[in-house]
């Protein structure tokens, strides 16, 4: 927390942890660990991955107290603040929402309802963090619970994370959901990706260095990041387009981050000069942003070795 917010209310955060530990005393998670390890992990996600404020971290530590203990909105309001109490109560209300339909129209209505119920956007952010930690520790639940929660996550929480521009969380939520919705398919893709990663490690490093060098020559200040596509995006492409993994050519992605819109287009020109672009695969999300206001340029190119 100190790294991004040196003036955070550390005394209040510590007090919230002590309050949560006292109220969850005697409660355990499915793996046998003290229950308080869960709100602590959620607070860690809120702080380290989302860089939210003190009130959000405190509310994350307390997010299950109204739902699962004798803590009250009034008491939390007095001990911490009315805003923290409202955040905790907001998360509790979202927790009580039940998912009964698999119809896409009903799912979309439910997503809209959850967004509307969260009068403060931080409620949704804490709830997504809560779901992310639960998915990270889902192996201790029954197979039935695993599939139920994974379906909810895939259909409700991952799309909301996408709308809020939380791409990394969206990807992880999707991958963790796939792990339980189709264990065999997930495992096959993970094993194949591990093989591809070992096979193409040198290739990715070479491309990274080529791009970095050309941008430096052009005087463009940029950060170049390389990654393999995440398992669910590959799974979806394989099953919706009836392809094998060997038929999915865009397994790797490079992200180039620059400071200006002009440099985005300059970088695109350099990339297309270095590698052959595939027709019909260019998307301009700067000129036409996505509904969540995501802006970037996307292109698919063919490397020197194909």
Per-range role (PLM):
Residues 1-253, 257-306:
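Active-site helical microenvironments for divalent-metal-assisted chemistry
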